[in-house]
Amino acid sequence: MASKEILFDAKAREKLSRGVDKLANAVKVTLGPKGRNVVIEKSFGSPVITKDGVSVAKEIELEDKFENMGAQMVKEVASKTSDIAGDGTTTATVLAQAIYREGVKLVAAGRNPMAIKRGIDKAVVAVTKELSDITKPTRDQKEIAQVGTISANSDTTIGNIIAEAMAKVGKEGVITVEEAKGLETTLDVVEGMKFDRGYLSPYFVTNPEKMVCELDNPYILCNEKKITSMKDMLPILEQVAKVNRPLLIIAEDVEGEALATLVVNKLRGALQVVAVKAPGFGERRKAMLEDIAILTGGEAIFEDRGIKLENVSLSSLGTAKRVVIDKENTTIVDGAGKSEDIKARVKQIRAQIEETSSDYDREKLQERLAKLVGGVAVIHVGAATETEMKEKKDRVEDALNATRAAVEEGIVPGGGTAFVRSIKVLDDIKPADDDELAGLNIIRRSLEEPLRQIAANAGYEGSIVVEKVREAKDGFGFNAASGEYEDLIKAGVIDPKKVTRIALQNAASVASLLLTTECAIAEKPEPKKDMPMPGGGMGGMGGMDGMY
């Protein structure tokens, strides 16, 4: 085991503090509408230019092990805030730096760090409650667009596209961000249920120009198992042929004799039929087949329910107004399922989302929910170069997360004003002792820091701006984009309350833990070994001195 280096007291805190400052100073230049970009070297490809706090934080690794510990702790603040709220990473980093910086001074002066932490915790609870009291719900598409615009660095195009996407797919809908092939940023909305499985044979195509298969008013068969034998399918095919309607077969797979027979019947015109593989794998596939069956008003054919394919009748099949299938995707539009069945299924999926602890499972459940109730919107981000594309895509994802948070918990005045407005509640807290009071005062001072930094990045004196905002009436604040003091909610300078709350809670949590650190342990760097002397020279080559 490698030997360790141990630092105590002020020495440990000084090293950690240096690491915190190095990371926070790199991140905080991006804060606010006039924040600057950071360029990051990559080991492959062109450098990345970004204004996203968490992207900057993730790139920072410091040479000194103790400084790096401080930096990694603040990186945790940014990452956690990004994971939960999706935005507000720079604000969280600025708050963490301010809380730790103020706290270190007090601990060095002999204050009790544990009591300071208690004071910080009390202050955060009070401020969080006050933020809830000044929160306004997002009322319309315009406010959603404003949140997106602010988060996307005042890009109104991005804000408007996100608001439009949310209006079309609803709160439960899935909105994804992809790279566009052109320069324009566009929105593509898929109505109905779409899954990533295409036709099993190109012979099923009904529109050779577009290479798609379009079925109007088809029956839909959902089968859990692989279909290989024609004998199993014959009864249901005969029933569908009698009513002269198209048929979509969704199964684990259709192959061999069964697939060949379907293709021959399609080519002869005896039956308009298409076979596609079921989406997903394992238990998730089963759940998605059940979703499709409920959406279309049919019954999924599962062996464990005692239903066999050869016994299926038309009443077990689902129907939809239209189905479009291409090489890679199937879209079912306007399924004929009963609304009460769909609502019950939605309720069940929501309960599973609440219960699951896996982020991956939650994401997949939300996708299923969106396909049942809302729809799927895809924002295609366009740019002239790959570097600009990456930077713009980061901003779109931030803005999307911010708007979701705004819809979820409402909005507060932006630009750091909500924090300054909340300072007054700290006067009502009764601290147990002077050390707890010191903890309250740390939060009192730190809550001004985001506004100071936004003002500084815009070229204004932070202290003067903070004083003016504090004296102004409720709702009024500093608009760094225009340099005006105005009603920020009317001006559209708004932040999601969830982002503001999570940023403060995470910053206080990590910074107060760092304050209570009395000892830091890291691996000793291995001493560099001197390079050995090179081997002997080129002896035995005498007699060449006459050569020029």
Curated annotation (Swiss-Prot):
Subcellular localization, as worded in the UniProt entry: Cytoplasm
Keywords, ordered alphabetically: ATP-binding, Chaperone, Cytoplasm, Isomerase, Nucleotide-binding
Example GO biological process: protein refolding
Record GO cellular component, one term: cytoplasm
Binding-site residues for ATP, renumbered to this chain: 30-33, 51, 87-91, 415, 479-481, 495
Pfam families: Cpn60_TCP1
Record's subunit section: Forms a cylinder of 14 subunits composed of two heptameric rings stacked back-to-back. Interacts with the co-chaperonin GroES.
The name this protein goes by in its record: Chaperonin GroEL
Natural source organism: Lawsonia intracellularis (strain PHE/MN1-00)
Organism lineage: Bacteria, Pseudomonadati, Thermodesulfobacteriota, Desulfovibrionia, Desulfovibrionales
Protein encoded by which gene: groEL
